[in-house]
Regions:
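Alpha-helical transmembrane segments of multi-pass small-molecule/ion transporters
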Residues: 1-318
């Protein structure tokens, strides 16, 4: 319940601030740049340093285990995106009518913000490494979102300035992994620097959720609800994608800690980042907003079912 309350509180804050014109429409772009190009990279870099360099956990810092976790995270998102793209094609969507936004919003789960409190509730032992495994796994998710995801939402690499790949979260992933695997991370991850990265990184999620709340306020008067894509988005994100991810967890020859994370990821609703990217790169944020809202609400019912199924068929969670 807490994860839903927190998310909706931020949505409501953004909605109210837009309603009162505290955050005006022309403020969105600079706030988005701060969130995407400053705060989010700090969050990613801090997570890599904390769990792969400073944790003292030999498993998390080993190259072979971290590559397994990163590959699993990337494969998850590629499966989800491919499933959503196929559904969008069956709906006869095209670029300009929601193909890109549907593919990314229905294909990408809320792989960090939504998952952290679930892991904290399920695995309470002080030395349990599952949360650390999540953050290493999420490096793979970040790689896919900020490369393939950005290419999809922009309508192809030809529509992008290549500089977009050499800043922000993707750069944080590349630099973070290079430092972690080379052994140089211990020299960089000093307490004052780490604290600064942590504090700036902690702004990323609230800023994104508040911006989404602003978008909800903009769209609530003139939003045209589209039942067919919404229902298909629900079935894709909370039906087809979870089934594919549980099959992946079952057959993938990876450590049980990674399988745990995959099971939880399978049950999660759509992420906010694709909606923000749709706004930034000329997608169809109305559709993304509708899929995000409906999958988040519906996951109240579906999330426990998928967790129970994964716990029974793949590896125990409880």
């Amino acid at each position: 319940g807490d994860v839903y309350k927190r998310q909706y509180l931020f949505f409501a804050t953004g909605f109210y601030l837009r309603h009162k014109q505290v955050i005006q429409a022309d403020h969105d772009a600079p706030i988005m740049r701060i969130a995407m190009d400053v705060a989010y990279p700090c969050l990613v870099f801090h997570s890599i340093m904390k769990y792969m360099v400073l944790s003292g956990n030999e498993t998390l810092s080993s190259v072979s285990f971290s590559l397994q976790a990163i590959a699993a995270g990337a494969l998850e998102l590629l499966l989800g995106i491919a499933a959503a793209w196929l559904v969008a094609k069956m709906l006869r969507m095209r670029i300009g009518t929601g193909l890109r936004t549907f593919t990314l919003t229905a294909g990408v789960q809320n792989y960090a913000f939504f998952v952290i409190p679930i892991i904290q509730m399920l695995f309470t032992a002080g030395n349990d490494p599952t949360l650390g495994v999540l953050f290493v796994h999420n490096v793979g998710c970040e790689l896919v979102v900020w490369s393939i995801g950005v290419i999809i939402i922009a309508g192809g690499p030809g529509n992008l300035n290549m500089g977009v790949f050499f800043r922000g979260p993707l750069l944080a992933v590349i630099v973070g992994l290079a430092l972690a695997w080379s052994g140089l991370g211990t020299y960089v991850a000093q307490p004052p620097l780490m604290k600064a990265f942590e504090m700036i990184g902690n702004c990323a999620t609230p800023l994104c959720l508040i911006l989404f709340g602003c978008s909800m306020r903009d769209l609530c008067h003139n939003m045209k609800w589209e039942p067919k894509p919404i229902i298909c988005g629900l079935l894709t994100r909370l039906g087809l994608a979870p089934a594919l991810l549980l099959l992946m967890a079952y057959f993938l020859p990876v450590d049980d800690y990674i399988k745990r994370v995959i099971i939880i990821q399978a049950a999660i609703p759509s992420a906010v980042i694709p909606v923000i990217l749709a706004k930034r790169f000329g997608g169809y944020p109305d559709l993304g907003t509708q899929i995000l809202l409906t999958t988040t609400v519906a996951s109240f019912l579906t999330l426990p079912c998928w967790l129970a199924l994964g716990s029974t068929l793949v590896v125990p969670l409880y």
